[in-house]
Design a protein with these regions (language model features):
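Hydrophobic alpha-helical segments typical of transmembrane helices
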Residues: 4, 8, 22, 46-47, ...
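Amphipathic alpha-helical segments that mediate coupling or scaffolding at interfaces
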Residues: 8-11, 46, 50, 178, ...
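Alpha-helical transmembrane segments
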Residues: 29-36, 40, 44
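Mid-to-C-terminal secondary-structure elements
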Residues: 127-142, 146, 151-248
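Short aromatic/hydrophobic contact patches that present stacked aromatics
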Residues: 27, 36, 219-223
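Residue-level recognition of transmembrane alpha-helices
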Residues: 23-25, 38, 179
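N-terminal Sec/SRP start-transfer signal
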Residues: 1-31
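Hydrophobic, regular-secondary-structure patches
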Residues: 41-120, 127, 163, 208, ...
Length: 248
């Protein structure tokens, strides 16, 4: 054993650079492993935190694309969900407790006075607030009267308040989004230091002025009741797909 240790020590002394590089590589590998494990846990916790406030009995529906040709239509046709689908879900499925929807209206330029920022705009129905667990730091969310009367009201987020209003009270102020004037009625909670901003207007208003009154929605949110087993959920999914497929 003594001779073996002496041989190792002699080899180390003769190859100092190689020894250093080997040790550094091992240390760097351990360091990166710790960083990746920490990042992975942080990402997981962040994702879970984002969904903590979502209704636990909710599901999201997206149109997607067709997988096979049908009735003269080619494979890969985009399925465009519409306002009428919400009525079908409410009327024909007793398991559906609440229905809501969003329409993404892409990036727009928002301005107030000499200040401006790029924002992600969406049109939503009032129940989205409860289903997605949206919290407000000021004012209110979109309501039924806004939707019914196509009101030009908007709910902004904290980054928008910071950039456009320098942290001042924005309620009742008018801003331009995509060249059109909206009145601020609420502010959503969130990290004010984020660079990206998002804002919400009534679904009907967005469909009317940005989509030529096209009734398409990008996703439908459902909250369910009376489904307690995997078998019940599977049966509901089959009936849901079969019924909506008949419409599209």
């Amino acid at each position: 054993m003594r001779e073996l240790l002496l041989e190792i020590w002699t080899s180390v002394r003769r190859n100092k650079l190689r020894t250093f590089l080997t040790g550094f590589s091992v240390a760097w590998g351990i360091f990166m492993l710790v960083i990746l494990l920490g990042s992975g846990n942080g990402l997981q916790n962040g994702v879970l935190a984002n969904f903590n406030d979502y209704a636990t009995n909710s599901i999201d529906l997206y149109g997607g694309r067709t997988s096979v040709p049908w009735m003269g239509y080619e494979k890969g046709r985009r399925i465009r969900m519409r306002n009428s689908d919400l009525e079908i879900l409410e009327r024909e499925f007793p398991e559906v407790e609440e229905v809501s929807a969003n329409k993404w209206l892409d990036g727009k330029k928002a301005t107030y006075g000499h200040e401006f920022t790029q924002v992600w705009l969406r049109g939503s129905l009032p129940k989205v607030q409860q289903m997605e667990g949206i919290k407000l730091s000021a004012g209110r969310y979109i309501n039924d009267a806004d939707v019914k009367n196509y009101r030009k009201v908007i709910v902004i987020d904290e980054p928008m308040r910071r950039i456009l209003f320098k942290g001042a009270d924005p309620l009742g102020r008018q801003i331009k989004v995509g060249g059109l004037v909206f009145t601020v009625v609420g502010v959503m909670q969130g990290d004010a230091q984020r660079n990206s901003s998002s804002c919400t207007i009534p679904l009907t208003t967005g469909q009317l002025i940005y989509s030529a009154n096209d009734p398409e929605v990008n996703n439908v949110i459902l909250t369910l009741r009376g489904i307690d087993t995997d078998e019940q959920m599977e049966d509901f999914e089959k009936r849901l797909i079969r019924r909506l497929s008949a419409e599209h």
